[in-house]
Amino acid sequence: MTKNIVITVDGPSGAGKGTLCYALANRLGFALLDSGAIYRVTALAALQCKADLTNEAELAELAAHLDIEFLPEAGEVKVMLGGEDVSGLIRTQEVADAASKVAVFPQVRSALLQLQKDFATPKGLIADGRDMGTVVFPTAQVKLFLDASAEERAKRRFKQLQNKGISGNFDQILAEIKDRDFRDRNRPVAPLKPADDALLLDSTTLSIEEVIAQALSYIHQKVKI
């Protein structure tokens, strides 16, 4: 077995990265890193200690000392901060808004870059994000880029909301996804793009089982587990 295997899964919002990464971590027995959640946890910690969201140095110092864990459990991933389950707390709009402010600071991104790198262990790691294969783990043994059309991702999001009993506007969801795609792909620092050596997986017309099967097949071609 290859030591310290890192498998990166990048892609836009709503492509199914979270579901794929959970399945891969579960089946391979690897640790899991959700980089998007890390920025939300940083924002939550900043709000809890009433940090100044415009003070880059203060936020970077806070980010450098966060104790974050991701625990796959019963079909979902628990996000732990200092031993406390904050999975629900980081999904609020207040935290999402704060995370977008925190993420623009280079010093914060630098601190969190090192924190993310530290997740790589002999156990193996599945890293879920937007710049895992290009910035955080450029030498990862396996790189995947999961994509889907904006329309399909909007349909999935709309269905998720319906299943939760939440009313949603499809056109608004689609517009938000397209807007986020534009921002992610055109940001000056770590724009969303496939690594040159990544396998591109388009999930637009695939079931999650088919995506998982293709990913596992490629992983076993690349590394011995």
Swiss-Prot record:
Keywords: ATP-binding, Cytoplasm, Kinase, Nucleotide-binding, Transferase. GO terms for molecular function: ATP binding; CMP kinase activity; dCMP kinase activity. SUPFAM superfamilies: P-loop containing nucleoside triphosphate hydrolases. InterPro entries: Cytidylate_kin, Cytidylate_kinase_dom, P-loop_NTPase. It is found in: Cytoplasm. ATP binds at G11, P12, S13, G14, A15, G16, K17, G18, T19. Gene3D superfamilies: P-loop containing nucleotide triphosphate hydrolases. The keyword ATP-binding applies. Belongs to the cytidylate kinase family. Type 1 subfamily. This is Cytidylate kinase.
